[in-house]
């Protein structure tokens, strides 16, 4: 298996959404995960939206973002047929490297409760669980 990591492009959009569905990630194609939103995000996060490709087939994604002081790992997903083969680890490391090049010294991620494989990946990669934090949000658009 010769999986390569490369920046995602707009032409990958349909494959990204299909991969997220196969891997069980919730997606919001009507709004924040729409093609238009994805295009805007690609421009804003140049070099941080990465895909794992087996030949031309998209088998994994990781979306790196930052607020100029902290990096974020988002949407780390691997096709179920490619899980437990190191693809997630390679995507995580590639994202860390890309964020470090942007000057990020701290990288964080939100992991859905009950997602033990993802939590284990981050633990094995040196991430610490921060128990004193609580995630809060406010939807300015109820469909967001």
Where are these regions (language model features)?
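Conserved beta-strand-loop-alpha-helix junction that forms the acyl-donor binding cleft
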Residues: 83, 109-118
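Conserved GNAT acetyl-CoA-binding A-motif
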Residues: 92, 99-111
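Conserved acetyl-CoA-binding loop-helix of GNAT-fold acetyltransferases
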Residues: 84-97, 124
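Acetyl-CoA-dependent GNAT
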Residues: 7-75, 98, 129-141
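Short, conserved catalytic or interaction motifs in soluble domains
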Residues: 78
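Extreme N-terminal starter segment of soluble prokaryotic enzymes
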Residues: 2-4
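Short acidic, glycine/proline-enriched helix-loop-strand junctions
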Residues: 117-129
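Short phosphate-binding/catalytic loops that engage adenosine nucleotides
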Residues: 87, 104, 127
